[in-house]
């Protein structure tokens, strides 16, 4: 998430939220596509007895059980790669958090999977915001999240999913949002 420099007299504070268009998703989708294609072609080569790969000689593999197993893993990898490329294309999880003093509305918008709930939008009035809450959990699976506490709705997460953001950025962003909205920060 970006940390724009915003003075409190500006009417709109907006944070873009990075969804599935992260470098790590591009990396894994590419690696899995290449590996899955290789495995699928190796399995197909063992079935057709024609070498379809520039490296190695999968023709020497017996189709049952080696070729069919390699082909199955190739198909599974290609299906996973299609899923990853689709989520990247649809930008699942991407969106923005917008705090608008002019209209008095807080909008949290995220893109979802295609269908009925493709666009996920939560709107609330600024007076309904009770606090900005920070949750920090260190360890093997660290969690650093900023939540917006709303009356009657509970806590709504504002930060992206995936790599935890640095503590200084987390604290600065929470302080900026709390200052902009005129509410307290909880959890520090």
Swiss-Prot record:
Pfam families: Ycf4. The chain crosses the membrane at residues 28-48, 68-88. One of its GO terms (cellular component) is plasma membrane-derived thylakoid membrane. Its main location: membrane. One of its GO terms (biological process) is photosynthesis. Signal peptide: none annotated. It is a multi-pass membrane protein. It is found in: Cellular thylakoid membrane. HAMAP family: Ycf4. Seems to be required for the assembly of the photosystem I complex. Belongs to the Ycf4 family. This is Photosystem I assembly protein Ycf4. It comes from Cyanothece sp. (strain PCC 7425 / ATCC 29141).
